[in-house]
Regions:
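Short, flexible loop/turn elements at secondary-structure junctions
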Residues: 11-13, 60, 98-101, 132-134, ...
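A generic secondary-structure signal for well-formed alpha-helical elements
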Residues: 13-18, 46-54, 58, 63, ...
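C-terminal beta-sandwich/jelly-roll accessory domains of carbohydrate-active enzymes
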Residues: 495-560
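Beta-sheet entry/capping signal
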Residues: 4-6, 52-55, 123-127, 249-252, ...
């Protein structure tokens, strides 16, 4: 697949123009975005950023403290729901749309199907979550197809483990978390979602969820009982097929490593047999298992959180020297094009937060690396392009530098850009308008320049270790090349203005098949008004340039 750009967005937040923002506020007080908020205009503006895919986060019905019993939806016990809105990752019904997101609750599935059609009409693709490891404690599907048994519906709850069961149980023990359960009763206790095999999870556990049983007996040395195929495998495959039939284009699979790789290889193969173009992205954090989840699990792409994200964050925060970026991509050993790069998502702290850089513009060079160093896809999180700081204390989600996934809230930067549905950016500051322009230029370059989407990469960092006019603690440089198209990237992670010189080794000319000594016209794709003299590419001539703080150059070299 050609390089693509994902825009992650929580519909709950995106279309909410209510600015009340009462701490721990209800739906009625703080409001909630809707699927219908993604109008043709909204989608057009998102696409104009250079986006190719939208990951609609929190689409599937999850536990909530909002009462929908008048629509035939069972009420959730508030003691086991995180936040008034509830976590998008505590799924309550795998076969339904979250009612919060519908203008008409009774037609919520049609509103989702219409959203998919609008998104495709805007020439964008649709990704949704698949949350396979855990469900809400009071999971019950009231929307499953006729004849589909509920998860846990046929379980033997007096058995701690059986491959026939969908959950794990703690026989003869009541659920007694280390918090006030306000009368909630669960007996026997089910095992909590983060592999907490005791009846008393803490506030730091995923106490609002229960773990699904894929036939691994954790209490007997992780014994695998996969023959015959466990019941959970069949039910979860059918859920994937259900959503694939809604014409979506991909799944982002939550905490994929907490589910056996054997299931993924089995299920993904069956889904792709019927829907060959659908993509699967795995949230993974164990580099030693990456190849296993690609080769045996059949995933198309994996999160590169532990490697490139952590590296770019530390480089931007000036904890690591910039030259360590080289070690990061080299450590992947050939699978770097199958990683998903990002600097923000719903789990991570905002770049502009006081916990990261304090200003979204400081991550411009890091974002250039994430987007252009390899052929891998790249993702941004709604509001990232607007400098969102994530420094609100919304309710269950405290002041932690993240935008809440638990509470009803209005995100100031998104509201300022959306301007009540006009999506004209009228309420943005000049600085944040400029930041959005940067993202728009960068991401469009990322998907249109063949040197980036299909080309070779040559890292120039090692060739400049001993260059006194290039600081490998603060600067980074590399080539991308496809046929006769050549790009030179020079990035400054320093907070100071400086002049720098980039040297070119003989190996670069050999690897990229560039003839030494040729002259090139230089154009900065991020600012085409900037003037450069002719560049002679040679081992004897360095490229000399001025660099502004926290900025990067994407230079297109045209032979003359």
């Amino acid at each position: 697949m050609s390089k693509f750009v994902i825009y992650q967005v929580l519909p709950r937040l995106f279309g909410n123009y209510n600015s009340t923002n009462k701490h721990n506020g209800t739906l009625e007080e703080n409001g909630c975005g809707k699927l219908n908020s993604f109008t043709a205009k909204a989608l057009s503006e998102i696409k104009s950023l250079g986006v190719t895919h939208i990951w609609y986060t929190g689409i599937i019905e999850h536990a909530t403290q909002t009462d929908y019993t008048s629509y035939g939806i069972a009420k959730d016990h508030p003691a086991i729901v995180k936040g008034k809105a509830g976590s998008a990752y505590a799924i309550k019904d795998y076969y339904d749309i979250d009612p919060d997101l519908a203008e008409n609750v009774e037609t919520r599935m049609k509103e989702f199907e219409d959203l998919v059609k609008r998104t495709h009409k805007a020439k964008l693709k649709v990704i949704i979550d698949f949350v396979p490891n855990h469900v809400a404690r009071e999971y019950h599907s009231d929307a499953s197809p006729t004849g589909v048994a509920d998860l846990g519906g046929n379980d033997h709850s007096n058995w701690a483990f059986s491959p026939l069961n969908n959950f794990y149980y703690l026989p003869n023990e009541a659920f007694t978390p280390k918090m006030d359960v306000q009368g909630y009763v669960e007996f026997p206790a089910k095992v909590t979602g983060n592999d907490c095999f005791n009846a008393s999870p803490t506030q730091n556990d995923w106490y609002e969820t229960v773990k699904l049983n894929y036939g691994v007996n954790y209490m007997e040395g992780h014994q695998k009982q996969f023959n015959p195929i466990p019941d959970t495998w069949i039910k979860m495959r059918d859920i994937l097929l259900f959503w694939a039939s809604k014409d979506i284009d991909g799944f982002r699979c939550d905490m994929a490593e907490m589910v056996p790789v054997e299931f993924w290889g089995w299920a993904i193969s069956q889904v792709k047999a019927k829907y060959p173009d659908i993509i699967f992205i795995a949230e993974v954090y164990n580099p030693s298992e990456y190849r296993n989840y690609i080769c045996n699990g059949k995933f198309d792409y994996l999160y590169d959180k532990v490697g490139m994200y952590e590296m770019l964050r530390n480089v931007t925060s000036r904890n690591f020297p910039v030259r360590e970026i080289t070690n990061s991509w080299q450590s992947l050993g050939g699978i770097e094009n199958q990683m998903l790069n990002f600097l923000e998502n719903h789990d991570e702290q905002r770049i502009g937060s006081g916990f990261f850089s304090g200003n979204g513009m400081y991550a411009e060079p890091a974002m250039i690396v994430a987007a252009t160093l390899t052929q891998a896809p790249v993702m941004i999180y709604s509001g990232q392009e607007l400098g969102e700081q994530g420094m609100d204390s919304e309710g269950f989600s405290g002041l932690d530098g993240r935008t809440t996934i638990f509470d009803y809230w209005g995100v100031n930067s998104i509201q300022s850009w959306a301007n009540g549905g006009k999506f004209d950016g009228k309420g943005l500051s000049l600085e944040h308008k400029e930041l959005r322009v940067f993202y728009q230029k960068l991401l469009n370059i990322t998907i249109t320049e063949k040197a980036i989407t299909e080309g070779l990469m040559y890292d120039l960092e090692f060739a400049n270790f001993d260059n006194p006019k290039f600081n490998t603690h603060e600067q980074y440089a590399y080539f991308r090349k496809y046929n006769n198209e050549l790009l030179l990237f020079v990035l400054n992670f320093d907070d100071k203005c400086l002049d720098t010189e980039v040297c070119f080794p003989l190996e670069a000319f050999q690897y990229l098949e560039i003839k030494e000594g040729q002259n090139y016209q230089v154009t900065n794709l991020l600012d085409e008004t900037e003037k450069f003299p002719l560049l002679t590419l040679s081992t004897k001539h360095a490229f000399i340039t001025y660099m502004a703080p926290w900025k990067g150059l994407i230079l297109k070299l045209k032979r003359v």
